[in-house]
């Protein structure tokens, strides 16, 4: 259904004025009339009415509504502050960044180190600057771990020694050495050469052993080497060592050379019976 528009009629405003001294005419003759005579007569009151036509006024409902401008609401990002660790020389900005600064003890001023995304990054930069300004004894956010013995290095060295013993003397390099071993190539070649050789192919070949009796005869005579045609005894005119050499010498019983314990009673063969074992040959391995 279409809504019928109400037609507003013009408004009329009537103004009425009552004038008790109003007259019908304004002639000069009437001005000469005696007022005393008129006072006794009935006075005539004249009323004036004036109409004013007012234009129609548009109703408030028909007036066009002005569009209201929406005010822009500036939203400030809310930074959620959690229970984080507080670092030395690090503070958080209102917009969420982390700033780092340090005080220079020599110049007595604050040195700006920069702005970072996380507090840990700012703390690390502060630690580096503190070490440069105050030395290794500076208070740090992340102190270095205490120096401990390197147990892994010791265990590696022990393992290398055990491998050397088990491997039959193979030349192994130290795990901490930076120098090349001159025997590494040779040991590798020898190891590759003996790979695949079975123990069944190794035959022990024994050579005849030499006894002490083989050395009983002299290899060379004195005459052949030095060319002596005569013996030493003939050169000096007789026996050099005769039977009576020790005849004039008398030994007491304290030396054990008496009648019962002379040179004849010594068992010389007992002292040299094992001489053949010294010259025995080791078995030779043949492949």
Curated annotation (Swiss-Prot):
It comes from the Eukaryota. InterPro entries: AP2/ERF_dom (IPR001471), AP2/ERF_dom_sf (IPR036955), AP2/ERF_ERF_subfamily (IPR050913), DNA-bd_dom_sf (IPR016177). Signal peptide: none annotated. GO terms for biological process: cotyledon development; cytokinin-activated signaling pathway; ethylene-activated signaling pathway; leaf development. One of its GO terms (molecular function) is DNA-binding transcription factor activity. Residues 86-143 bind DNA. Gene3D superfamilies: AP2/ERF domain. PROSITE patterns: AP2_ERF. Keywords: Activator, Cytokinin signaling pathway, Cytoplasm, DNA-binding, Ethylene signaling pathway, Nucleus, Transcription, Transcription regulation. It is found in: Cytoplasm; Nucleus. The keyword Transcription applies. GO terms for cellular component: cytoplasm; nucleus. The keyword Hydrolase does not apply. PANTHER family: ETHYLENE-RESPONSIVE TRANSCRIPTION FACTOR CRF2 (PTHR31194:SF140), SHN SHINE , DNA BINDING / TRANSCRIPTION FACTOR (PTHR31194). Belongs to the AP2/ERF transcription factor family. ERF subfamily. Component of the cytokinin signaling pathway involved in cotyledons, leaves, and embryos development. Probably acts as a transcriptional activator. Binds to the GCC-box pathogenesis-related promoter element. May be involved in the regulation of gene expression by stress factors and by components of stress signal transduction pathways. This is Ethylene-responsive transcription factor CRF1. The gene is CRF1.
């Amino acid at each position: 259904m279409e809504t019928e528009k109400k037609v507003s009629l013009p408004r009329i405003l009537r103004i009425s004025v009552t004038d008790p001294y109003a007259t019908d005419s304004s002639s000069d003759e009437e001005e000469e009339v005696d007022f005393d005579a008129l006072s006794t007569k009935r006075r005539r009151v004249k009323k004036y009415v004036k109409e004013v036509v007012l234009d129609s006024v548009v109703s408030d409902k028909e007036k066009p509504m002005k569009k209201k401008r929406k005010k822009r609401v500036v939203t400030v990002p809310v930074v959620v502050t959690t229970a984080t660790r507080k670092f030395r020389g690090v503070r958080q900005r209102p917009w969420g960044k982390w700033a780092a600064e340090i005080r220079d003890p020599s110049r007595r001023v604050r040195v700006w180190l920069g702005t970072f995304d996380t507090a840990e990054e700012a703390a690390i930069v502060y630690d580096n600057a503190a070490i440069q300004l105050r030395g290794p004894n500076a208070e740090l956010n992340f102190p270095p771990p205490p120096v401990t013995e390197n147990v892994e290095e010791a265990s590696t060295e022990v393992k290398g020694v055990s491998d050397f013993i088990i491997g039959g003397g193979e030349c192994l390099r130290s795990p901490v050495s930076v120098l090349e071993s001159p025997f590494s190539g040779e040991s590798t070649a020898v190891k590759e050469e003996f790979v695949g050789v079975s123990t069944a192919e190794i035959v022990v070949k024994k050579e005849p052993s030499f006894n002490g009796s083989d050395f009983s005869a002299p290899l060379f005579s004195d005459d052949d080497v030095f060319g002596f045609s005569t013996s030493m005894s003939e050169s000096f005119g007789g026996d050099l060592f005769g039977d009576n050499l020790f005849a004039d010498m008398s030994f007491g019983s304290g030396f054990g050379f008496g009648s019962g314990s002379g040179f004849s009673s010594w068992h010389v063969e007992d002292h040299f019976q094992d001489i053949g074992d010294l010259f025995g040959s080791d078995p030779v391995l043949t492949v």
